[in-house]
From Swiss-Prot:
<comment type="subunit">
    <text>Part of the 50S ribosomal subunit.</text>
</comment>
<keyword id="KW-0687">Ribonucleoprotein</keyword>
<comment type="function">
    <text>This protein binds to the 23S rRNA, and is important in its secondary structure. It is located near the subunit interface in the base of the L7/L12 stalk, and near the tRNA binding site of the peptidyltransferase center.</text>
</comment>
<dbReference type="InterPro" id="IPR002358">
    <property type="entry name" value="Ribosomal_uL6_CS"/>
</dbReference>
<dbReference type="GO" id="GO:0002181">
    <property type="term" value="P:cytoplasmic translation"/>
</dbReference>
<dbReference type="GO" id="GO:0022625">
    <property type="term" value="C:cytosolic large ribosomal subunit"/>
</dbReference>
<dbReference type="InterPro" id="IPR019906">
    <property type="entry name" value="Ribosomal_uL6_bac-type"/>
</dbReference>
<dbReference type="InterPro" id="IPR036789">
    <property type="entry name" value="Ribosomal_uL6-like_a/b-dom_sf"/>
</dbReference>
<keyword id="KW-0699">rRNA-binding</keyword>
<dbReference type="InterPro" id="IPR000702">
    <property type="entry name" value="Ribosomal_uL6-like"/>
</dbReference>
<dbReference type="InterPro" id="IPR020040">
    <property type="entry name" value="Ribosomal_uL6_a/b-dom"/>
</dbReference>
<keyword id="KW-0689">Ribosomal protein</keyword>
<dbReference type="Pfam" id="PF00347">
    <property type="entry name" value="Ribosomal_L6"/>
</dbReference>
<keyword id="KW-0694">RNA-binding</keyword>
<dbReference type="GO" id="GO:0019843">
    <property type="term" value="F:rRNA binding"/>
</dbReference>
<protein>
    <recommendedName>
        <fullName>Large ribosomal subunit protein uL6</fullName>
    </recommendedName>
</protein>
<dbReference type="GO" id="GO:0003735">
    <property type="term" value="F:structural constituent of ribosome"/>
</dbReference>
């Protein structure tokens, strides 16, 4: 049995899970998330806990039981507390603002970048150089943050660019004659 799948996932108050043949749906105060399932994992709900087990003795089923348990745990956390990712803009004239369902970025190009946000994702700009991306789906929040960062990754000589708030950019030394 997978070491991760040994531990059950507890459902907090206000969160409910429904298991069908090929998918699991988790509903909570922040929304509803759906995850497709394979036949390799058995999920049982009892007394506010979800337990996971491999359906057979194959290595693939064992690995999938741990993977599905981790995905469902992230879904439960997402619909109850939510996830957020913070980005920081470093550079002269680099600015960000939220315009409806999009983030407007000024990153030193000749044009402004308008990044549309997918459904269920919200963005805030507490200051002109900070972006906070929030949502219930951990994978989508991380993907949106990575897409925004990819417009202007931090360069290694001055550190200018879009970086995660907890990211450390190693600054290289310039060439010397």
């Amino acid at each position: 049995m997978s070491r991760i799948a040994k531990y059950p996932v507890e459902l907090p108050k206000g969160v409910e899970a429904s298991i069908q043949q090929d998918q699991i749906t988790v509903k909570g105060p922040l929304g509803t998330l759906v995850q497709a399932l394979t036949g390799d994992v058995n999920i049982v709900e009892d007394a506010g806990k979800l337990t996971f087990a491999a359906a057979n003795d194959s290595r693939h089923a064992n690995a999938m039981s741990g993977t599905v348990r981790a995905l469902v745990a992230n879904m439960v956390t997402g619909v109850s507390k939510g996830f957020e990712r913070k980005l920081t803009l470093v550079g002269v004239g680099y600015r960000a603002s939220v315009q409806g369902e999009a983030v407007k970025l000024q990153l030193g190009f000749s044009h402004d970048i308008l990044h549309k946000l997918p459904a269920g994702i919200k963005a805030e700009c507490p200051t002109q150089t900070e972006i906070v991306i929030k949502g219930a789906n951990k994978q989508v929040v991380g993907q949106v943050a990575a897409e925004i960062r990819a417009y202007r990754e931090p360069e290694p000589y001055k550190g200018k660019g879009v970086r995660y708030a907890d990211e450390r950019v190693v600054i290289k030394e310039t060439k010397k004659k």
